[in-house]
Amino acid sequence: MPNTLEQFKSITTIVADTGDIEAIKRYQPEDATTNPSLILKAAQIPDYAHLIENAIEWAKSQSDSIEQQVEDAGDKLAVNIGVEILKIVPGRISTEVDARLSFDKAGSITKAHKLIKLYKEAGIDKSRILIKLASTWEGICAAKELEQEGINCNLTLLFSFAQARACAEAGVYLISPFVGRILDWYKKDTGLEYSSVEDPGVVSVTEIYNYYKRHGFNTVVMGASFRNTGEIIELAGCDRLTIGPALLEELANSQTEVVRKLIPTETVVDAADPLTEAQFRWEFNEDPMAVEKLAEGIRNFAIDQGKLEVMLKEKLAC
């Protein structure tokens, strides 16, 4: 009998949530995702030193301003790591726009264009890239314009149905609803423990998946941010799941039988009219968990981006 991970691959596209190339080689996912926290972690791996050096030298050649060099080096490093990962995975890499642009539509679009240009200069076509943006109203609007240009997007830090609905209505290629972080909030708020089937994060992704399929939306649902394999098993059949190395290892070492839980409906019905900005903001604001976790996620990604920039600034000064 195939291990649990191999069983999963027959019904759900498995994506590696890591910048660790060795882990990606080990588990052979279809795609990979990165974020500022994972880039910061990857930058401390000795085998990546040459990627950092390349980013530093490139940044120095682009500007005399140290602030601009730091920004350029960060962008180039993210792309360098993405290029290395794409030598292994057959599918796509998700590369994230600076979290500090989460409420800046124009800035997000400009940064996305820059990342796509850097990938193109490295010989990577945009068809293999997903631009990650936070699921703010501004991020969703930026993604809508980018999608119309043929640049596919991955809307991340998604915690609510309102965010998911707005993403689908904007024609976003893929969303990443965060399962584990939703569970974290409810456990802290209620003091309760949840079985995998009752897990609020699992329930949220299931609702989003069913809504998309029932109304014929093509946006891919990729569950993310898992705390345990039970959550993953309950989402068998989801379009994609992005999983960190530790849980990929657990699945690879398990013989648990995988039974498909999410099944697309055969009947498609028309959806309601798209949310207006006012409706989106009200519905999102009505979910205190989503409001708190989105704000926290943006802050934490920005903090790690700042830590990475401190490291790069030190190297640029050498």
Swiss-Prot record:
Gene Ontology biological process terms in this record: carbohydrate metabolic process; pentose-phosphate shunt
Reactions this protein catalyses: D-sedoheptulose 7-phosphate + D-glyceraldehyde 3-phosphate = D-erythrose 4-phosphate + beta-D-fructose 6-phosphate
InterPro entries on file: Aldolase_TIM, TAL/FSA, Transaldolase_1, Transaldolase_AS
Active site residues according to the UniProt entry: K132 (schiff-base intermediate with substrate)
Pfam families for the chain: TAL_FSA
Single GO term (MF): transaldolase activity
Keyword set, alphabetical order: Cytoplasm, Pentose shunt, Schiff base, Transferase
Location relative to the cell: Cytoplasm
Highest taxon listed in the record's lineage: Bacteria
GO annotations of cellular component type: cytosol
EC number(s) recorded for this UniProt protein: 2.2.1.2
Functional description taken from the UniProt entry: Transaldolase is important for the balance of metabolites in the pentose-phosphate pathway.
PANTHER family tied to this protein: TRANSALDOLASE (PTHR10683:SF18)
Assembly description: Homodimer.
Family, per entry: Belongs to the transaldolase family. Type 1 subfamily.
UniProt-recorded name of the protein: Transaldolase
Species of origin: Shewanella sediminis (strain HAW-EB3)
Phylogenetic lineage: Bacteria, Pseudomonadati, Pseudomonadota, Gammaproteobacteria, Alteromonadales
